[in-house]
Amino acid sequence: MTEQHQPPSDLRLRAVVPAPPKIVYEALTDPAALRVWLAEHADVQLPGKYEFWGRYTPDGAEPHQRVLHVDERTIQFAWTVDGVETTAQFELAEDEDGTLVTLSQSDLPSFQDVLADTAGARGALQTFWSLAIANLADYLSGRELTPKCDFTSAELHASVVIDAAPDKVFDSMIQPEQFRKWFGANVDIEPYVGGRFAMGGLELDPGGAKFVEFEPGRKATLRFADNETTSWELEGSDGKTRLTMVHSGFDPANPPYPGWAGWLGGIAGLRRYHELPRRRSIWRQVEIAGVPAGMFAIDQ
């Protein structure tokens, strides 16, 4: 363990989770807990070791973390991903609603490389952490977790049950003001076959994806400029909705994990939006170097 470096700056995520700092710190450092909300495998023996790896971790065939600094509120570690050493840090602070968790990381690829699918495993780190922190919040609440992204699979498919009727869930996925609240991004949506769907808004993405299927309350399919598709299917039972999401049409040798992990993190927010309607979003800040202004919509 060495002296603490400056906090990493390429990525900063801040979220409030529903537990005091001591309990959150335990969830961050107990290997059994980490194997529930973060990774397939974990080995933690502080102050000397903080490792996690497996199929739910980018470049996760082996552990590649090295502790830099730990104290009662901070865990900072080097993490080599695709041969590039990054620095990641968890920092905890008290909050009136629990604990403010700040995750920061350095040495990430450019946003343009991520969009072009040329960023490799490092390109998935932002959405990997967003999904992980959402699952940390649900873990601490005793709620069912959202499926993790399997970085070894070329099948991008997930199914969750949401405690709300299909019409309400569907409307929240195609009404921009509702979408903004649970996904945390601005969006323009034209809700009909041939209509556009533009993350960040049509000013940032004039072409957008286009709906090629649209059945209100039941199903929608988006086709992107590269001919990849994302489909949502909703099935109701006893006032609840089984939402199944599938992404297809990509090169199986290069699955678009960054975008898929982003959708999974969104599903976590969608579940909380309907099942915990009196609570505000967990997110307080999302900063990613190079992302255009106006992309994110976080209620401070």
Task: State the predicted function of each range.
Residues 146, 281-300:
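Acidic/histidine-enriched, glycine/proline-rich intrinsically disordered or flexible terminal extensions
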Residues 24, 34, 67, 77, ...:
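Hydrophobic pocket/interface hotspot
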Residues 130-141, 267-278:
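Short amphipathic alpha-helical signal-transduction/dimerization elements
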Residues 3-5, 10, 74, 78-130, ...:
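Beta-strand/loop substructures that line and gate deep hydrophobic ligand-binding cavities in soluble
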